[in-house]
Structure formats: C-alpha cells, structure tokens
Curated annotation (Swiss-Prot):
Family: Belongs to the complex I subunit 1 family.
Biological processes per GO annotation: aerobic respiration
Organism in which the protein naturally occurs: Orientia tsutsugamushi (strain Boryong) (Rickettsia tsutsugamushi)
Oligomer status and interactors: NDH-1 is composed of 14 different subunits. Subunits NuoA, H, J, K, L, M, N constitute the membrane sector of the complex.
The protein's name: NADH-quinone oxidoreductase subunit H
Lineage of the organism: Bacteria, Pseudomonadati, Pseudomonadota, Alphaproteobacteria, Rickettsiales
Residues spanning the membrane: 22-42, 59-79, 93-113, 124-144, 171-191, 198-218, 240-260, 285-305, 321-341
Membrane topology listed for this record: Multi-pass membrane protein
E.C. number: 7.1.1.-
InterPro entries according to UniProt: NADH_UbQ_OxRdtase_su1/FPO (IPR001694), NADH_UbQ_OxRdtase_su1_CS (IPR018086)
HAMAP family named in the record: NDH1_NuoH (MF_01350)
Key words, A-Z: Cell inner membrane, Cell membrane, Membrane, NAD, Quinone, Translocase, Transmembrane, Transmembrane helix, Ubiquinone
Enzyme class: translocase
Source domain of life: Bacteria
Length: 356
C-alpha cells in the first residue's frame, strides 16, 4: 500500500519504477560481487602475510604467485559433501550460517566508499543500522551451537554470546563519542565533519579509536579473542560440525565483518574517503582510493596481530571489556563533552538541541 501511495504521489509510471528497480538490483549485485571478491582475497592476503612473518612461502601453486588460490578454495568447498549430524536440528542447522552471512553483507548497504558512492544513504540512523545488523550476527552463531547438538559447538556459542556483552558496550560508546563531537548520525556528514574538526576526531579520539579497534577484534572472533572457535579447547567451536558451503558462509561472514568493521573505523576515526590530514595537494586522487587504502591499513593490523599475539583467557577478555574499556570510554566521553561545552566548540546540530 505504501509503495502504491508513493507511486501516485510522485507521479511514477510503471516504466520508471521498473527502471529504478533494475538500477538498484544492479548496484546490489555489483556490491555483493565486489564484497565476495574482497573477502576471498583477504584470506589470500592473510595467508601470504602470515607466511612472510613466519619465514614461509605461503600459497604459491594455484596460478601465478598463488593468485588463484581463493578461487581454488571456493571450488573445493562448493563440491564438498554437506554433512548434517544425525541428531542435529536440521532446519536451524541450515539457517544459522545463512543468518551470519546475510547480516555481514547487509551492513554494507549504508557504507559510503566515496561522497557519491553509497548504496543507500540513511540520514538519521546509518550508525544505528550498522550497530543493529552487526549485533544480530551473533544469533547465527548461537543458533549454530544449539542446532549442532555438540558440546564443543554449544560451548563456542555460549562464549560468543558472553563475549558480545563484554565488548559491545565499549564499542558502541566509543562511536557515541564521535557522534557528540560531530553532531551527526549520517555517515557522510561524519566524514565531512572531519574536514573542519581534524584535531578533535584524530588526536582527541585516539584512545577511543584504539578501544574500538580492539573491540572489533573481539567482535569478529579474531586473535587474541578467538575464544568461540578456539582450536586447542573447542576443536573449531560453533562451526565444528559444518562443512561444504555452510562452513564457507561462516568463513566468509567472519571476513566480511572484518572489512565492515575496518570500514566503519575508517569513517569514524580516519577521515573516510578524505585524503590524509585533508591535504589539498592530495585531492586529485579519488576518494574511494583513499578509503580502500585506509581500510587495507586497518586490515593489515588484523593480520599482524594474528601472527603476533597469543589467545587471551576467557576471564581476561571479560575483565578487559567491562572493567578496563568501559570505564575509560565513559570517562573520555565526559572529558570530551566538558571541553566542548566550555570551549564553545559544540557542533551546531547538538547546540541547537541543547538550547531547546
């Protein structure tokens, strides 16, 4: 009914509606293909980088320099037999990886790669949409642990739920601090605000940027916080019973979330598609190039940490999230807000709301 009302109100005819639907469909398909390729080659980059750090060669047989290795891995997983445990809940067992995979892609619909390159611009709730979508991804893991009817999988799912409680508050509040400084919830406006407030969003937000980065390490179950899938304790955790494309969906979902978390960090703390320090001399380079370079830099830190640090104990993660990060973020929000008020540097949008 709403669609019909919009068509009548805006004077759209059937041809225009079909054309617009076709354009949106092409954009969605192009975005999904680019994300799948980026995710596949992130796994290749990870294996190469870690191999270099460990004085190994890494994948080098499939194609020149091993560049076809992700495609070979994808073909292998497609042709593997999907095995479902006899006592598993069949429907939930199949649905769980689909939930995780779809939600990992859904957040990309509002990410601005450049000022004019964004699938769907949400002016008010872009940040809330991403936080909601990424937080729902844990339900896929919990369902997988329950449906597998395995003790290892169930323990991995319980760990994932408790882990989310530990880091989610600190991560969300670090984003709230950025919203206070910019006075915006539109992702593009947050990037544009960093043209006029580079000191506030780089130097003042640096501690929160570090906390946010560590939180997305936990969010994506990466070392040193890969407790839900700890090989030495839980074999493979929540996905221990999965094979074939179901396992591939969990695998792709994890790496797609890595790219999504790195992209959001780039937008919040690193200037998004703007050149470094907003230097005029570098504006001739397209914004999406800067965006990709910054995201790649954050992703390299993911890989570097995996090759360097051991796994945290479970109690250490809980302590870090709730007793270290949460008080620091709350204190930093109070400090930044106080400085903004007493230095008359409140953003116009926030000042208007407070004056009312």
């Amino acid at each position: 009914m709403t669609i019909c009302t919009d068509i009548i109100a805006n004077g759209y005819d059937l041809k225009t509606l079909i054309y617009n639907s076709g354009v949106v469909s092409i954009k969605v398909i192009a975005l999904i293909i680019c994300l799948l390729l980026a995710t596949a080659y992130l796994t290749f980059a990870e294996r190469k980088v870690i191999a270099y750090m460990q004085l190994r060669v890494g994948p080098s047989l499939a194609g020149p320099f091993g560049l076809l290795q992700p495609i070979a891995d994808a073909i292998k997983l497609v042709f593997k037999e999907p095995i479902i445990p006899a006592k598993a809940d069949r429907k939930l067992f199949i649905i769980a990886p689909i939930i995780t995979f779809v939600l990992s892609l859904l957040g990309w619909s509002v990410i601005p790669i450049d000022h004019d390159i964004v699938l769907s611009r949400i002016h008010i709730g872009g940040i809330l949409f991403i936080l909601a979508v990424t937080s729902l991804g844990v339900y896929g893991i919990i369902i997988a642990g329950w449906a597998s009817n395995s003790k290892y999988a169930f323990l991995g799912a319980v760990r994932s739920a408790a882990q989310m409680i530990s880091y989610e508050l600190a991560m969300a509040l670090s984003i709230v601090a950025v919203l206070i400084v910019t006075g915006e919830m539109d992702l593009i406006q947050i990037v544009e605000a960093q043209k006029t407030r580079p000191i506030w969003l780089t130097i003042m937000m640096l501690p929160l940027a570090v906390i946010y980065f560590i939180s997305i390490l936990a969010k994506t179950n990466r070392l040193p916080f890969d407790l839900p899938e700890a090989e030495s304790e839980l074999v493979a955790g929540y996905n221990v019973e999965y094979s074939s494309m179901a396992f591939a969906m969990f695998f792709l979902g994890e790496y797609a979330n890595m790219i999504l978390g790195s992209s959001l960090m780039t937008i919040m703390f690193l200037g998004g598609y703007l050149p470094p320090f907003n230097l005029e001399i570098l504006t001739f380079i397209p914004g999406y190039i800067w965006f990709i370079l910054k995201v790649s830099m954050v992703l390299f830190c993911f890989l570097w940490i995996r090759a360097t640090l051991p796994r945290y104990r479970y109690d250490q993660l809980m302590y870090l999230g709730l007793k270290v990060f949460l008080p620091i973020v709350l204190a930093w929000i109070i400090v930044v807000s106080t400085i903004l008020v007493y230095s008359n540097n409140l953003p116009i949008a926030l000042e208007t709301v407070l004056n009312k």
